[in-house]
Curated annotation (Swiss-Prot):
Disulfide bonds: none
Name this protein carries in UniProt: Lon protease homolog, mitochondrial
Binding, ATP: 602-609
InterPro entries: AAA+_ATPase, ATPase_AAA_core, Lon_bac/euk-typ, Lon_lid, Lon_proteolytic, Lon_Prtase, Lon_prtase_N, Lon_prtase_N_sf
UniProtKB keywords: ATP-binding, DNA-binding, Hydrolase, Mitochondrion, Nucleotide-binding, Protease, Serine protease, Transit peptide
Region (Disordered): 85-177, 288-311, 819-866
Ranges annotated as biased composition (Basic and acidic residues): 88-125, 294-306, 819-835, 853-865
Species, as recorded: Kluyveromyces lactis (strain ATCC 8585 / CBS 2359 / DSM 70799 / NBRC 1267 / NRRL Y-1140 / WM37)
The organism's taxonomic lineage, starting at the top: Eukaryota, Fungi, Dikarya, Ascomycota, Saccharomycotina
Primary localization class, coarse: mitochondrion
Domain Lon N-terminal: 185-450
GO terms for biological process, alphabetical: cellular response to oxidative stress; chaperone-mediated protein complex assembly; mitochondrion organization; oxidation-dependent protein catabolic process; protein quality control for misfolded or incompletely synthesized proteins
EC number: 3.4.21.53
Amino acid sequence: MLRSSRSRLVTRNILLRQFKNGNNVRLMNATRFQHNGIVGNEKLASDSQKFVDESYHWMQYRKQMNDPVSRQRLEQLESQWVKSIQLKQDDKGKDIDQPESENRKKEEEQVPTEEKDNDTAKESETSQQRDSVAETQGPASTSGGASGNGESSGNGSGDDGNNGSGNGKPSKNAKQPFPEVYPQVMALPISRRPLFPGFYKAVVISDERVMKAIKDMSDRQQPYIGAFLLKDSTVDTDVIHKADEVYNVGVFAQVTSAFPSKDEKTGAETMTALLYPHRRIKLDELIPPTSEQNLKDESDVSKSEGVENNEQEVVKASLQKMENMKDVEEDDDENLTGFLKDYDVSLVNVSNLADKEFNPNSPVINALTSEILKVFKEISQLNTMFREQIATFSASIQSATTNIFEEPARLADFAAAVSAGEEEELQEILESLDIEQRLEKALTVLKKELMNAELQNKISKDVETKIQKRQREYYLMEQLKGIKRELGIDDGRDKLIESFKDRVSKLQLPETVQKVFDDEITKLATLETSQSEFGVIRNYLDWITSLPWGIISKEQYSIPKAKKILDEDHYGMKDVKDRILEFIAVGKLLGKVDGKIICFVGPPGVGKTSIGKSIARSLNRQFFRFSVGGMTDVAEIKGHRRTYIGALPGRVIQALKKCQTQNPLILIDEIDKIGHGGIHGDPAAALLELLDPEQNNSFLDNYMDIPIDLSKVLFVCTANSLETIPRPLLDRMEVIELTGYVAEEKVKIAENYLSPSAKKSAGLDNANVNITENAIVSLMKHYCRESGVRSLKKHIEKIYRKAALNVVKQLSIDDKPMENEEVKDQKDIKVKQSENKSSAEASTVESTTEENELIKTQKSHDNKGSLEVPETVSVTVDENNLKDYVGPPIFTTDRLYESTPPGVVMGLAWTSMGGCAMYVESVLEQPLTHSTQPTLERTGQLGDVMKESSRLAYSFSKMYLAKKFPENRFFEVAKIHLHCPEGATPKDGPSAGVTMASSFLSLALNKGLDPTVAMTGELTLTGKVLRIGGLREKAVAAKRSGAKTIIFPKDNLSDWAELPENVKEGLEPLAADWYEDVFQRLFGDVDTNKGNTVWSEDFKKIDEKRNKETK
């Protein structure tokens, strides 16, 4: 009875250790109990396995100990096991004749013997793990053998084909089997692709806690982990914090080797571990790596173990022994994963996943297997690496079985392991437990791999073909060069071609241009230099490689800088400057200013060209200007055909070559004076393509014959008038009008810009030579009355040139020509050289010396500084001595008429030169008599519009006079002649109606008008005053002519409000809606009686004469 109880105690302790460790290796307990006589009992092994299968891990077991039903079942299994052991011992007759003391001694030695066997097994397993990587090359086999392969005598037991035993002693070099059940393991997240059973994978671990845990696991002979694929491939972690971070299906893997390494980027210490997956597992529960969770788990374990109060003292003692880990030396052996909690890593409770049963003879599985093998064969023909992997896998299959069709599951795993599929696809294969579905998914991934391999092979062949072709061409060209070098033939063509290729390598040619260049360079290489086409192609390639393909200057859109530049270059012109700043501000917001064509319209000399230069400076763009005034050949814009001798590209292409940037500012000057269609084409029509933002992105020059992008070019045009610009061309441009300057603006421009520049160019920069403000004002009144400042600039330059002449005369400087001195020096040098010819060496030395002296003399003459004018020499130009410098005045008075006779009125006109005063004169050709017939004669080179205006004004005047003064019959017999002075100047425009009507009425009423009144406006037949244009220019002209009152249409009040104050200053505006407003201002003092009787004496005589004739 004592023997029976002790045997139960030994058995109970062994079973409890197995439950805690989770080490349920098949029949291993039978090997460990050989020394105690417990050998080969199959029922014992079966009951032991049932007992183990009651719980998947140790935590569940301890909870079940509190359940009465589970505890009762445990006692039943224990009783059956002990009973079987006793019956087996009684059947064999062991221990019957032995004394009871000896039996008791054997039973007490059971536990140390078993523990010794465990130590021996662990040493063997450590040796197996160290040599596993070296022994296995390529995919490893997970199939177990049927019998032990170690040599032994006596009874031996098979252990998955890994270990053999004889007399209960395992072989020293035998492999330690991996556990079939391992409920709780450390979890390791894997990124990018999952692991598959039977196929090695190296992972890099950077977490220090995980590295220490793996090292400790290896030292404890338990290097097992659970590897799970991360759902987010961008996450880089070695610890799982939440279960939803990874897929719940992974692999149970063994760390076969681990060695330290370093991160190449950060230099941090890492560990490279080689993992060998054994089987699929499922994540049941995650134990996150938090201290709070660890404390909670320990508290739950303590409570669970504290309530264990079962009837068996042996079970209670074993549980207490496992809790008191510090008091027992075998604590680490009894708890395989408990030590990992100290490293704060993630632990998981897992369960094994087994493949579903399948029919090896299924036609679907066999067909899928055959198709996979076929795809493998095709890939192996394209990819060498695949070929090696397939060979290794085939060798491993042949070592375990003779037919690949017997293991389709391994074939599917191998296909997934070697394919570069998507993460989700590979994970689906790992989660597939149905072999048919796994084969289908593996085949899909493998088909994609085949497509990638075919594409890669095609690309590789194409690249290889190109490389071979280039190498062949290079080899032949080098041979050709060598042959020419030996024959002494060197025409420079090869160097020319190399220079073209070198220039192209620095450019970014579009694909179409690159193709043209390659074709032309190939053609050039086949031509002889003496052929005429060689020169044509050479020039063409020179132009292609000279254009700035892909070169763009960096723009700047600084508003303050642009404003500063505009103020430096121009005075006034506030409206124009604001418009340009708006343009730059829009470019700053958009980051570009392409697609805009600006047209500056204004009289000559107002700064249109200089404004364009200022815009280029403010935008940091290159500037190019060309004029199209009088251009009649379309080839100037579009270029000539290459077939012509001396053919050249158009002006725009030449601008790109000169500026060396694709975004210059090109100024097209005098666009209103461009020629029209003729035998050489229409240049204006060619400009349509050039200036159209929708078309100039692929501008086709006749010479280049390739599309050129001009959309980044900023085009600025200038014109004096919009009348002659073709309407389609005008629609493509944004017009900005530049008006003339008033006297105050001209004075400031002359003082701040024109005078300093002219003074410097005359060499009087440091001289005491000045022009007074009164002189400038007098210069504008009597010499320069144009709207711009070009004539003023010429007169100022003339003044400074005469002043320079006077300064030089005052200084009495010797004016001996410098050239004579140089000639004399050269003659002296030649004489010295001829005298020193006695010695060759002396001659050489002296001639060299003299030549150096001559060079120094020339340099000293060239670098001679400007003349300094003493302060005592002073020249002042004022209004009194102005005529000494520029001659007598051209305009002696401000107005043509100081007092206007009847019929003379000051009108205002707009011309391409700006505004001007235009007088209208009306006179009676002969006195009023009874025989004269009323007629109207017009002179002054009037245009058709002005002729119609005069006829309309004449009719309106007759109607208005008859209405206002019915007794005044002036127009019944008046023979009138209307003239506009300066008959050599053509005149036309729709704004002279009011002026002509006022002239007719002034003559009819025989009243002279105020000479300080200027007027403009067009009349209708009923007397309505219509809107006109160019009010600013006309106001400037009125002020320049000394007018004090300006009459204009009421509809132009908005234009008047926008005029600068310096223009409106001194002018009294009168906005007329009907002619009655004009009449009241001009003839307000004429009463009805006076108007009716002004010609009463003349008409009295006429009536008397007619009465006599009728009698």
